[in-house]
Amino acid sequence: MLDQTDRKLLDLLQGNARLSNAELAEAVGLTISSVHERVKKLERRGIITGYVATVDAEKLGKPLTAFMRLTVETTAESGIDEVHARMSGACASDPDILECHNVAGEDCYIIKVRAEGPKQLERLLSKIRGMAGSSRSVTNIVLSTYKESSRIEPAPAPEADE
């Protein structure tokens, strides 16, 4: 369970992971060593899983964002576990695949990709379709992005019984 101080630390670090323990301590009203211990505990518990830099994809030459929805039919030779293994391997090995989700509903997978342009996107989509043994795919190209964030607000703390 997270207390208010842990929640505040997570909020601060998600906003700027480069904050020093001294800056965090000042913001939450604790000592530097207490903050250090709390952050280490959040890491050990797997709540904080890493620290990353947010980059501008356009400035890195990858201005095109697309979402691909795949439907995969399984056969006796190619069961769902095999398809998941192929998809997991393909997604993990390609740096242009930013996210890959196995989903419930009409589609089997939703994949977020970044590409230099239409030709690179076409090659990437062909590769993904081939790896999945896709029976159907729909690709949506992003025209404008109004919000893109990896920030996660913790669920509210359960209320104590009165």
Predicted feature residues:
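A compositional/biophysical signature of low hydrophobicity enriched in polar/charged and small residues
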Residues: 1-162
